[in-house]
Amino acid sequence: MHRIAVLTEQETRVAQMEEQIARFCKEKGRFPRIEPYRNQESFFNAVLTAAFSHAVIALPGVAGLNAVEHLRALCPACRIIWCSDLDFSLHAFRLRVDYFLLEPVTEEGFRRGLLVWLEGRTSIAPFLFDSNNH
């Protein structure tokens, strides 16, 4: 069974992302275990216990960059969607992030990231960047 971690400091945001992931997965006939985290300490303790198959990192600024770098070091095979208020798209490419979203994240943009996971694209697939400036 897939384990999807959602790491964000905002309580309302973690609930929204959990709901979006659950709805998307249900539509596709998948039922992963979704685990919310509101701080990096508890998130990384969970990673050390048992690696996640997928993770959404939605932290501001350098905190997000540090979390993605640390997660990639601990769990090289983890599939990652990274949401940031700063344009770290080059870092995301270097860190083999599956999908990078620049804030503000739209439901449509987040869904595209989830589709990348579902389609099983590898880290060598063309890098996807969503600026949400449509």
Task: List each model region and its residues.
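A Lys-centered signature of the CheY-like receiver
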Residues: 103
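Short amphipathic alpha-helix used as the core "switch/output" element in two-component signaling
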Residues: 63-77
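Two-component/phosphorelay signaling modules centered on CheY-like receiver
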Residues: 11-35
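Non-catalytic signal-transmission and effector/linker regions of two-component phosphorelay proteins
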Residues: 1-5, 9, 15-18, 124-134
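CheY-like receiver
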Residues: 107, 111-134
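Acidic, metal-coordinating helix/loop segments flanking the phosphotransfer/catalytic sites
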Residues: 36-53
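A short, hydrophobic beta-strand element within the central beta-sheet of small alpha/beta folds
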Residues: 56-57, 77-87
